[in-house]
Amino acid sequence: MSGEAVKSISSADFSGGTEIGGGKSESVLKKIGIPLAIAVFALLLLMPTPTGLSYSGQKALAIFCAALTLWVAGSIPIYLTSMLAIIALTLTGTVKERVAFETLGFDVIWLMVSAFVLTAAMVKSNLARRFALWMITSFGGTPKRTLLVLIFINFALAFFVPSTTARASLMVPICVILLEIYRAVPGQSNFGRLMMLLGVQADAVATSGVMTGTAANMIAVKFIKEQAGTDIGYMDWLLAAMPSAILTMLLTFFVGLKLFDFRGESGFSEGMAKLKEQLAGLGKLSAPEKKAMVIFVLTLLLWATEDYQEAWFNGFGISVYMTAVIAATLCLMPGIGLITWKEANIKWDLMIFAAGAYAAGNALESTKGAQWIIGKLVYGLGLETMAPATVYVVVIFMSMFSHMIFTSKTVRTTIMIPAFIALAKTLGMNPVTLALAASFTLTYTITLPPHSKVNTIYFATGYFSVLDQLKYGLVTCFIGAVLISLSVFTWFRLLGYGL
């Protein structure tokens, strides 16, 4: 059965992105996707260039929006859309050819390649299967409890592994094995859809609750200290952010049960006794499992200590990406490793898809198109005329959905947090409260596969479609924004943050 799990990853269908979910709405989207994308491209490209937006930014905006339309509609394979985006970026002179092509060499591409290798190694060695069976028999007596256990693990890892992508690389192999045990078929099982999408969302929501969960959080803290004069500590962030994060995740879980109802699925009748028999049948740890465990623990330690290595070793440190490459190399090394290159089943169509997505997004940023859009949103809504309570809500919702325009948490933090601090000072509001609340939303990059590295890693399993993620992600973002807004007016006040 471990071989089947590997195949479930390698056979993930990236041809269109929306055929996985099925349904009339997706069929209509596929039919109108190409003409709609052409219309969007032509409209944005040929309209008079707005004041403050360069023509290069206008071209980047047209290409990005047209590509986004095709990715969501799934009218053509998503990797083909990425290739068209790269072609359009270069032929229109929006970016230089070298810049468009170099995205295939980004560190995230290496991380994704390494994630495929690590996943295949954990599966083939049976270590992932052993852990999954142990987890189910110990804590996951029902499918719902299994999902809750996975959410808990994601939140726990956020404290120890300061990288969203690293945590996804750890969790995906476990999820694949669990779904194999439950006989969930990629593209057909609602349980599979929900498990993978909850993985995406738990990763992001947990990150918002821990200051060290991502670099963007720490950048926000730095801006608040430098521009608002307040030093936000680890526990300050945790106490302010974690309650809304936990409530958001719980509500999202129950919404997911409604959106992806799996009660009619078969495969859950396999009794706990049989699962315990399977676990017992694995016997003692085998040599491949011991090798996999050593590689896994080494990888986890390097990921968890990334932020401290330079201080410990006089400026020397190993990044999350290099750690993944080292681990993948060990898995492939003759005599030491666990799998061959062919067994890794690396999906290069996914790499092309990701490269094109980053090329389009980076072009929007480098041409100042993204900054122009954010500027219009921040200063074009007439916030200075609104009541302070309304400003908080608008800013929180704006921050939450800003990843729909461009995806980098770091870039959005760098652009938006100083702008919100300045806005608060102008309006006589508390800049710390406004900036902190906005910062909690910036990790919610959960609505489309290109919006984060985590999304692409989970999307590679083939269990959910672009449209599945879009509808669930939008609901989760709305819930998160509402709860953070309520937290500002209640919980923040108890913690001493004034409006």
Where would I find each of the regions flagged by the language model?
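Membrane-embedded alpha-helical segments and adjacent helix-loop junctions characteristic
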Residues: 49, 66, 79-80, 84-186, ...
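C-terminal structured "cap/appendage" subdomains that terminate the fold
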Residues: 427, 435-468
